[in-house]
């Protein structure tokens, strides 16, 4: 390292920062250092030695609810993971995906994957959409494992990265209300550890343990109140999972029971499921039923889906950066990312009676 520093005309500390991915050196400096290292045949600091000196493993974990298969198949989760991977690679830090069950009862045993994180196989964890009372969350906080949350849990002293879910939900509902829709169906991700049964009117949907969905539903109520439309009929159904099959089953039941003229989905996956069900039933979109999603995953653009855009990859990058700062002993912080309504071709005026 000393020879590389001399050849590059920088300090040894700068060489160390370059290889650790630290922001203390510019990209131009980093390239000069790497070029000098290549000329000298230097391949970088000894990772094992560095880990021993710092007491670190060099790997972070990402806790995802449900199975790993569901996580990688969900386009929104995949974009979050992409952002986390980008930051981890720059910092030369490994990444481990840790699935956790949706259980929240303290009387039930925790997910068996957790001992891996608690045995010191990771230096810290990113928690994605875990309930605040999940036993895994309690175990992590009790053992003071460096952690950051994406969307939830929201707990005192725990850094998190999120969006204004309530405000975004209000924008989503306001859009369909402004088109004249008064009979609206909501296809939701699971509002708690177990999906609710059947189609329910919005006022009957309570309590909601998932923080971001609780805020979305509050946003829907805000939009209705602001529009002065107490007679609007809104029915909610929960899909068993965030996949097309679960979404299609939920949408089919919603259409049969509530006959909505607009479908508001809490994810693009379920919005696409709605489009598939409507097409199979020869129900024209948006002439007879409008559909709006949430996330603006790549499939939304392909399907011409109106949706709420959230910066998924950027949320992942922010969470990973905050976690690496925590592991290094730097300040805790939180981040709120912006959202945007993206109007495409799946929403339009309500049909005339």
Task: Place the predicted regions along the sequence by residue.
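Amphipathic helical "hinge" segments at domain boundaries
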Residues: 31, 35, 43-114, 124, ...
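Structural motif
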Residues: 93-119, 127-130, 190, 236-257
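N-terminal helix-turn-helix DNA-binding module of bacterial transcription factors
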Residues: 1-58, 351-353
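Short beta-strand-centered segments that line the small-molecule binding cleft or hinge
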Residues: 110-164
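Short acidic/polar active-site loop segments enriched in Thr and Asp
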Residues: 11, 58, 123, 181-183, ...
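Short beta-strand scaffold positions
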Residues: 5, 127, 264-266
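Bacterial carbohydrate/catabolite-sensing allosteric modules
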Residues: 39-40, 86-90, 141-149, 153-353
């Amino acid at each position: 390292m000393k020879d590389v520093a001399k050849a590059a005309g920088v300090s040894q500390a700068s060489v160390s920062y370059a290889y650790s991915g630290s922001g203390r050196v510019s990209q131009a400096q980093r390239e000069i250092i790497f070029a000098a290292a290549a000329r000298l045949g230097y391949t970088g600091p000894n990772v094992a030695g560095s880990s021993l000196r710092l007491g670190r493993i060099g790997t972070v974990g990402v806790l995802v609810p449900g199975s790993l298969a569901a996580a990688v198949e969900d386009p929104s989760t995949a974009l979050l993971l992409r952002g986390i991977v980008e930051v981890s690679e720059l910092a030369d830090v490994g990444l481990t995906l840790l699935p956790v069950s949706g259980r929240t009862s303290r009387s039930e045993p925790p997910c068996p994957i957790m001992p891996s994180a608690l045995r010191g196989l990771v230096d810290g964890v990113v928690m994605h959409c875990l309930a605040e009372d999940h036993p895994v969350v309690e175990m992590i906080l009790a053992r003071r494992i460096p952690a950051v949350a994406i969307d939830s849990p929201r707990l005192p002293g725990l850094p998190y990265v999120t969006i204004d879910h309530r405000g975004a939900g209000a924008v989503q509902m306001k859009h369909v209300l402004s088109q004249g829709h008064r009979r609206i169906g909501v296809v939701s991700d699971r509002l708690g550890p177990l999906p609710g049964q059947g189609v329910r009117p919005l006022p009957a949907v309570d309590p909601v343990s998932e923080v971001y969905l609780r805020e979305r539903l509050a946003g829907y109520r805000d939009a209705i109140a602001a529009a002065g439309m107490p007679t609007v009929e809104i029915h909610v159904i929960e899909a068993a999972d965030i996949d097309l099959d679960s979404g299609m089953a939920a949408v089919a039941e919603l259409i049969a029971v509530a006959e909505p003229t607009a479908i508001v989905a809490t994810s693009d996956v379920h919005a696409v499921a709605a489009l598939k069900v409507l097409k199979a039933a020869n129900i024209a979109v948006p002439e007879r039923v409008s559909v709006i999603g949430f996330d603006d995953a790549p499939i939304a653009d392909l399907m011409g889906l109106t949706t709420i855009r959230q910066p998924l990859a950027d949320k992942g990058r922010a969470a990973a950066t905050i976690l690496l700062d925590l592991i290094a002993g730097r300040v805790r912080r939180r981040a709120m990312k912006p959202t945007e309504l993206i109007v495409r071709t799946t929403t339009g005026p309500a049909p005339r009676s």
